[in-house]
Amino acid sequence: MTSASTKVGEIFSAAGAAFTKLGELTMQLHPVSDSSPAGAKWTETEIEMLRAAVKRFGDDLNHISCVIKERTVAQIKTTVKRKVYEDSGIPLPAESPKKGPKKMTSGVLSPPNAPPPSSSSVPEAGVPPIKKQKADVTLSALNDSDANSDLVDVEGLGETPPAKKLNFDQA
């Protein structure tokens, strides 16, 4: 067995022992016959301790489930973002967040830093700059979970529009 499967086996063995003990305690709590010893009667404090332990166990499992779900969703989003960047020919941003998703009250992440402009996008001297159509992919657009929202078309993001030539010879 691998190390991970050994650890999982140990977890299930411990869980089995815990559930066996819970079953024993439950049987003590609700004796089958009236002939049970007088010491088997539980006090309210003991019952509350058992209830609290079982509740903590359930809460801990729910917390672990949420952590795993958030990590899985973050991994899927990261994979999709990387694929979008690769397919569009845009280099990945230099800073890749390793801290996990940023939580904000508005539910929208800040847009990534735009990659530095390449030398081919700088206009030549004497030619007025051309207003470039904005086609940046933002994190909020990628993180939008609404299936019916407008999709970002990443085809042609790397292409530069043809430069308009000015004719100064007309008089």
From Swiss-Prot:
SUPFAM superfamilies, per the entry: Homeodomain-like
Keyword Phosphoprotein: yes
InterPro entries from the UniProt entry: Homeodomain-like_sf (IPR009057), SANT/Myb (IPR001005)
GO MF term list: DNA binding
Domain of life: Eukaryota
Compartment(s) of residence: Nucleus
Region (Disordered): 86-171
Domain SANT: 38-83
Keyword Phosphoprotein part of the UniProt annotation: yes
Subunit (UniProt): Component of some MLL1/MLL complex, at least composed of the core components KMT2A/MLL1, ASH2L, HCFC1/HCF1, WDR5 and RBBP5, as well as the facultative components BACC1, CHD8, E2F6, HSP70, INO80C, KANSL1, LAS1L, MAX, MCRS1, MGA, MYST1/MOF, PELP1, PHF20, PRP31, RING2, RUVB1/TIP49A, RUVB2/TIP49B, SENP3, TAF1, TAF4, TAF6, TAF7, TAF9 and TEX10. Component of the nucleosome-remodeling factor (NURF) complex.
Job description of the protein: Component of chromatin complexes such as the MLL1/MLL and NURF complexes.
Protein name: BPTF-associated chromatin complex component 1
Organism: Mus musculus
Lineage: Eukaryota, Metazoa, Chordata, Craniata, Vertebrata
